[in-house]
A protein has these predicted regions:
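Residue-level marker of regulatory loop/turn positions in helix-turn-helix DNA-binding domains and
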Residues: 89, 107, 144
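Short helix-to-loop capping/linker segments positioned immediately adjacent to catalytic or ligand/cofactor-binding
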Residues: 85, 104-106, 140
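Hydrophobic residues in well-ordered beta-strands that form the structural core
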Residues: 16, 106-108, 188
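N-terminal helical cap/lid subdomain that shapes the substrate entry/recognition surface
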Residues: 2-93, 113
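Catalytic-core regions built around general acid/base machinery
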Residues: 92-101
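Short glycine/serine/threonine/alanine-rich loop segments
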Residues: 39, 68, 102, 161, ...
């Protein structure tokens, strides 16, 4: 059965965020932690990494332990002067997305303004029916970004489909694992993965833990999925 809804991650799925964006994002987050908490650069970087590892998001750790407001954090850490000139996608991937039947939705832990800038730079805004950004991931007064399973169920419900009628296309295996646990099929996008010495074993290890998740180097064959 052809999926009724395609859910696409943004960074490192639709474009190569590792090429320019992530280094600047990490720097901006470290600077934000330093200025907000009044700590030195080394401690700020340590906290950024610790919260990301513990909660899946630096923001969640800052909200939980330091009362940081999400809107302020997202605005200050995602401004990125020169972003549009440094967004690099792949034309074959975008052409493949255009061929897909069913609704096409961007599902990103990034803020909406940033997501729209990236899509605009890719000339891909019209390819998608909707953008679900981190601002849309609050449930019961708590922010629940990917890989929160409750949020993924809520997204499917909001779109009027069951989880098994969606396909999540992602570069992050932890998000794909959460999707699988609620019955949502997944595609692990590898085009923009950084190929270090341990990349092969990492892919093999996660592939074993993600039974049923298809691993692809590009999106050209998505329309063949059933």
């Amino acid at each position: 059965m052809t999926p009724r809804v395609w859910l696409f991650d943004l960074d490192n799925t639709l474009h190569d965020a590792g090429r320019w964006v992530f280094a600047r994002m990490n720097g901006e987050m470290t600077r934000y932690v330093q200025q907000t908490l009044g700590v030195d650069t080394a401690e700020a970087d340590r906290l950024r990494r610790e919260y990301w590892q513990r909660y899946g998001s630096t923001l969640l750790g800052l909200m939980r332990h330091h009362g940081v407001r999400a809107a302020h954090f997202l605005h200050e850490t995602h401004r990125f002067e020169g972003l549009e000139q440094n967004v690099l996608g792949h034309r074959h991937d975008l052409a493949a997305i255009a061929r897909l039947r069913g609704r096409r939705v961007v599902l990103t832990n990034a803020p909406r303004a940033y997501a729209l800038r990236v899509l605009g730079a890719l000339r891909a805004t019209t390819l998608f029916d909707e953008v679900i950004a981190i601002e849309d991931m609050t449930m019961f007064h708590q922010l629940r970004p990917k890989p929160d399973r409750r949020m993924l169920r809520h997204v499917a419900q909001r779109l009027g489909v069951a989880p098994h009628q969606c396909v999540l296309v992602e570069d992050a295996p932890e998000n794909l694992r959460a999707a699988r646990e609620i019955g949502m099929p997944g595609v692990w996008m590898q085009r923009f993965a950084r190929r270090g010495a341990h990349a092969g074993p990492r892919v093999a290890r996660w592939s074993q833990r993600l039974a049923g998740v298809r691993v692809v180097r590009g999106l050209a064959r998505l329309d063949a999925l059933r």
